[in-house]
Amino acid sequence: MINKEPFQKIIDNLKESGNYRVFNDIVREKGEFPVAIWYGPYAIKNIVNWCSNDYLGMGQHSYVIDSMKTALETAGAGAGGTRNISGTTHYHNALERELALLHKKESALLFTSAYNANQTTLETMGKIIPDLLFISDEENHSSIIQGLRHSKCRKEIFKHNDVQDLESILMSNPGPKCVVFESVYSMDGDIAPVKEIIEVSKKYNAITYIDEVHAVGLYGETGAGICERDKVEVDIINGTLAKAYGVQGGYITGKREFIDAIRSMASAFIFTTSLSPVICAGALTSIKYVKDHPELREKIQERARKTKEEIERQGIEVLKNDSHIVPVIIGDPIKCKAVSDELLYKEGIYVQPINWPTVKRGTERLRFTPTPFHTDAHIFDMVVKLKSALKRCGKKK
């Protein structure tokens, strides 16, 4: 019989420290985004969603939904197997071709999530090149950290976005190397000096691996990300279909031989049921639509700037960055949860508290993600209510 005590102790400690996670029960109604329905403990009411990663609202777009309906009626609900055993459909192949085309790469490979894509790819690279040294940005995502850990390769950590520190590590480590970093960091919203990192990595003949999860669909002429925007060539790109493209799944792109080796050697890819063809159909439609509609990228940046300006106008400090992400640092987990609850329960504003372990202790925050569909009225209303909630919870700014 399982002893419940150690598990309950963990939960009690999380609750006491303010780091216990509560999953809010919401329903997003098609055509109403960013308004949603919240099934709260005391009532059911409309809320305005300020923390969705469906950055462009493509998860609600009629073209995406219609293509998924068609695929559902044509191919059924599930893939029916792993990619090797009956789970590769025309929809999977078409989507992988489109992703390779988007990033101007030779090949692409789908995964069930971008987390899975990162962890599995990095782990498998370690199997293929056992003496590979991974050089990782100190702010990299959990999926990257886990991938490096499971690779069993040596790793060095360079200071966040510090090209000089990166070069010193590259210089002192001969042999095969891979520099792993992100383009847009999801919690602070800062953008890496991608061009400089790639240049110094190439100087020392290192493989470059970039996570563009919070950039694909949002930056670059066709939405291929920061690499496209900055006109730079990277060896391996990790991306997602679940944020700007509004559906589900992750992927990697790169040289044909590299992708084929990962496909052939990655256990977590080989032994997993593949994405539903319905998901693939929706993602393919979304990518093509977003590629052809740069006004969506322009609008989300304009909405982010507007949101930052209005928050600062009220005397509230916003963490400075050049991206679409709007972080407001609270600096205390209990207060962060309290402000979030005030906004949700009293004001109908939904922004999830971001606490440890997602961010470092002492940097707890509310992370706002304005979309092209947040109006001026939404922004003004949220900012006034945020200021009041901060005051009621004992934080003036």
Please report, for each region that a protein language model flagged, where it lies by residue.
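N-terminal "arm"/small-domain region of PLP-dependent enzymes with the aminotransferase-like
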Residues: 2-6, 10-75, 206
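Active-site phosphate-binding strand-loop segment of PLP-dependent enzymes
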Residues: 54, 156-210
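Conserved PLP-anchoring active-site segment centered on the Schiff-base-forming lysine
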Residues: 121-142
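Active-site PLP attachment segment
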Residues: 222, 228-261
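PLP-dependent enzyme catalytic core of the Aspartate aminotransferase-like
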Residues: 58, 62, 66-70, 74, ...
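Conserved PLP-binding catalytic core of the aspartate aminotransferase-like
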Residues: 298-305, 312-348, 363, 370-372
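Conserved N-terminal alpha-helix of the aminotransferase class I/II PLP-enzyme fold
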Residues: 65-113
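Structural motif of enzymes handling amino- and sulfur-group chemistry
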Residues: 274-293, 299, 303-305, 312, ...
